[in-house]
From Swiss-Prot:
UniProt protein name: Probable E3 ubiquitin-protein ligase RHG1A
EC class: transferase
SMART domains named among the record's database cross-references: RING (SM00184)
Organism: Arabidopsis thaliana (Mouse-ear cress)
Record field: catalytic activity: S-ubiquitinyl-[E2 ubiquitin-conjugating enzyme]-L-cysteine + [acceptor protein]-L-lysine = [E2 ubiquitin-conjugating enzyme]-L-cysteine + N(6)-ubiquitinyl-[acceptor protein]-L-lysine
Lineage, broadest ranks: Eukaryota, Viridiplantae, Streptophyta, Embryophyta, Tracheophyta
Gene (UniProt): RHG1A
């Protein structure tokens, strides 16, 4: 039987599949070889042959499609014939997206099958996503259209919105109509020949997506809009079968596995489209995506096994490979957002591998937990610019079923000029040790230590300067050197920059970067803040001591030790210490009446007087007699402030001061002190009798 030839043309580029005659049952053998790559995982994503007649089949997982297979070729003569008849009138829903004129090519889940053939079908899942290609940058230009199938050959029809199929036998049409965004899975195949091309996407055991939606608005690169829901993270692997040597070169692009609804991939590569000759691949070759660096893969730009990202609408994620492009500005109203991540295609690890040996599927999640993003789930805006300085590279090992896949993500927090790498994973302790020993790391620690020292002395120096610190060399030496610039830490995540700035009296601003970032500890900062108030009082007290010594400089009677003994709080407890002898040093003679009342209320009423019997026995009494002295020389009673009259009882204390007898008795009952000289009024000690 003469073989049929199927051609899929895309403008100037064409993808040719040429198959020879097949009379054996080699299709089954080839699919068995393919299943050896990961039988356990493929059986979760493939449906049985008995279920292949359904036009719109649901996947095994809820709203998840884990496998896409496409096969072209001639029907084998040994296949079953009872399953092909249901595909002659197979229909599908196409989604047409408005906007952007004729510069967008819409590729929805398109199913093309030549009519008039009775080939048995295999399980093929054509869940192609909606793809938009900018005409001004992309070398491949296309109009809105669908695939036309004319007999044995298929090609892309540019101008139309209808899907036509003209077969040799019966003719069937698949109409394209606008539908809602509800995504439906389409299962089908054209033949069971194993010489056709297909893409096999497998889901890792430990991979999962956190539901969320993203909006991608780059100037160039990869633009993604829609919702990502329960798709695999990281890279995907595809199996490329044999192609004839005569097949032309065709661009190999990575198709990201996703079970989202209406995911839009806009590819605007600024460089030339790299091609890969299919003849260089052998049967069963495992291609690790991305193959060419110019192909921007969705899955390699999203973090593989990094964190569960909750991407909310209105946030941007930009991928760019053009180093000369303008950075994307952060929209207003996003002041609470974190600094952006920058993802580019510059640091990319990929290639081809002929090894299909099984490897472990467990993902090294511990490597990704030590990154600068805290927590397992993080709501983070992702604004990226195409230009970055130095990249903080952290490799995450991704092991997919029976294929070793490595991904190197390039992450950088925005900064001014210098990019500081975040703490690496625990597996690279050697690299972290070398970073700690680097001159840059040591310089940062030295600068922060200097800032801590200056913050402790900043307020002290300022107060000393305001309070005549120039007169005292001791206080002048405590002040930091006068300089117009000071180093102030600026917050910026792992890319914290050191800038020259006027030194602030309030001290430097430290941004707490987390436990993993080396910085000034909080106890030290609290000590610096508490020392400001204490240092102000200390400076004031020291100024008073020095002023007292200066005033007494001529007499040379007062020493520094004497002053410090009188006010020892300067040397010991400072402002927070309790001086229990403070009340004894009060100058009550120079206090006002209001101050004395306040002092009395604070001290309280303490009875230190004597009883009436002691007063009667100890108080000397006499009658007042006027003398020849002038009335101006006579003093009134100090207690009642009344003048003495002739014959009044007078009481005399041991100090010799006289008062009205009744007045001094009441006084002594309260306080056994002389109201005038403050000495002991009555001696209560028993006197020895003289024999």
């Amino acid at each position: 039987m003469q073989g049929e030839r199927a051609s899929l043309g895309y403008l100037s580029e064409a993808l040719n599949f040429e198959h020879g005659s097949s009379s054996s049952n080699g299709v089954i053998d080839h699919w068995e070889n393919i299943h050896s790559l990961g039988d356990n995982d493929l059986q979760d994503y493939m449906i049985a042959n008995s279920e292949s007649n359904t036009s719109l089949a649901n996947s095994v997982y809820h709203e998840q499609q884990g496998l896409r297979r496409f096969s072209l070729g001639e029907a084998s003569s040994s296949g079953t014939k009872d399953e092909a008849s249901s595909h002659n009138e197979q229909r599908m829903e196409t989604r047409c997206f408005d906007g952007r004129g004729n510069e967008i090519i819409d590729l929805d889940p398109v199913f093309a099958q030549p009519s008039g053939t009775n080939q048995p079908v295999q399980n093929v899942n054509l869940n192609a996503e909606y793809i938009e290609i900018h005409e001004d940058i992309n070398p491949y230009r296309g109009r809105s259209g669908f695939i036309e199938a004319n007999g044995p050959g298929t090609r892309v029809s540019q101008p139309g919105r209808s899907f036509e199929e003209n077969g040799v036998g019966t003719g069937s049409s698949v109409e394209g109509r606008r539908a809602s965004c509800k995504r439906k899975a389409l299962e089908g195949s054209i033949s069971q020949s194993s010489s056709g091309g297909y893409h096999d996407f497998q889901r890792g055991e430990s991979s999962s997506w956190t539901p969320g939606s993203t909006v991608f608005r780059p100037g160039n690169g990869l633009n993604i809009s829609g919702s990502l829901d329960n798709g695999p993270r990281g890279m995907v692997s595809g199996t490329v079968p044999n192609f004839p040597v005569s097949a032309p070169n065709f661009p190999v692009s990575a198709i990201a596995e996703s079970s989202s609804r209406n995911i839009c991939v806009r590819s605007n590569p600024s460089d030339h489209q790299e091609t890969v000759n299919p003849s260089t691949f052998a049967a069963g070759t495992v291609v690790r995506r991305p193959v060419p660096p110019s192909q921007l893969n969705l899955s390699r730009h999203l973090p593989a096994d990094q964190h569960s990202l909750d991407l909310r609408p209105g946030q941007s994620f930009v991928v760019s490979r053009n180093p000369n492009s303008t950075p994307v500005s952060i929209p207003p109203g996003s002041r609470t957002m974190l600094p952006p991540f920058r993802w580019t295609g510059s640091s990319l690890v990929g290639g081809t591998s002929n090894s299909t040996a099984p490897v472990e599927r467990n993902l090294h999640l511990d490597e990704t937990r030590s990154r600068s993003i805290p927590g397992n789930t993080l709501e983070i805006p992702m604004f990226a610019a195409p230009e970055v300085g130095n990249f903080a590279r952290s490799q995450s090992s991704r092991n997919v079923t029976n294929g070793n896949l490595n991904s190197a993500s390039s992450v950088s927090r925005t900064g001014s000029t210098t990019s500081v790498p975040p703490p690496p994973p625990p597996s690279s302790n050697l690299a972290w040790t070398s970073y700690q020993n680097s001159p840059h790391y040591q310089r940062r620690r030295t600068e922060r230590s200097e800032l801590a020292r200056r913050s402790l002395l900043s307020s002290l120096a300022a107060d000393a300067t305001n309070q005549r610190s120039g007169d005292h060399p001791t206080l002048r030496s405590l002040a930091p050197p006068a300089s117009s610039d000071g180093l102030v830490l600026q917050p910026g995540g792992d890319n914290s920059q050191m800038h020259n700035r006027a030194y602030s009296r309030a001290g430097p601003l430290f941004d707490r970067q987390g436990d993993s970032v080396v910085g000034i500890p909080h106890p030290l900062r609290a000590l610096a803040a508490a020392s400001r108030g204490r240092s102000r009082l200390m400076v004031s007290q020291m100024q008073n001591v020095l002023d007292v010594m200066r005033r007494d400089a001529n007499n040379n009677n007062l020493r520094l030790e004497d002053v410090m003994l009188l006010n020892h709080s300067v040397l010991f407890d400072g402002a927070t210490g309790h001086d229990r002898y403070r009340d004894m040093r009060l100058d009550v003679d120079n206090m006002s009446y209001e101050e004395l009342l306040a002092l009395e209320e604070r001290i309280g009423d303490v009875c230190t007087g004597v009883n009436e019997e002691t007063i009667s026995n100890r108080l000397k009494q006499r009658k007042y007699k006027s003398n020849t002295k002038s009335p101006q020389d006579a003093e009134p009673c100090c207690v009642c402030q009344e003048e003495y009259t002739e014959g009044e009882d007078m009481g005399t204390l041991e100090c010799g001061h006289e008062f009205h007898s009744q007045c001094i008795k009441e006084w002594l009952k309260q306080k056994n002190l002389c109201p005038i000289c403050k000495t002991t009024g009555l001696n209560t000690a028993k006197k020895r009798r003289i024999a």
